[in-house]
Amino acid sequence: LLVVIIAVFALLNRSGEELHEGEILIEAGGNTLGVLTVADLQKLPAVQKKMVIQSTGGMTKHEFTGTPLLDVLNSIDPGLTQKYTRIITKGIDNYTSGVEMSEVLKPNNVFIVYADYGKPLQTKTGGEGAMRIIIYQDEFGQRFTNFLTSLEFQ
């Protein structure tokens, strides 16, 4: 059973494209639709989201700056939300999670954020330019993807 679990995670974490901190590779059906940077996101309407995240390390307060994922998707292709039902998110650390399109379509729910208390999010290597998925209606933050590098539509 352990071998099967490891094989499944290896399959989920493989990628034909090189992932880079500070960039989000957008893929669907094995095709690359584009690459987004913080500068690209900053061209879209920004929102501030205050939240407290509960995790094994305790509670942390945040005031994120970012943009709704729906706005990001519509800037790439307004039909994406109709063509696909799920988005697999991946970080540079190979953390992989999933977001249902129905969650993305809910108002005030799924965001790509790039700053906390007005300061750029740090990359895994300590630089500036990281991005993160937050799901506002997920109080424990278990599906938040830090160091976001990939969105794969399914």
Outline where the language-model segments fall.
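N-terminal intrinsically disordered, low-complexity segments enriched in P/E/S/T
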Residues: 1-154
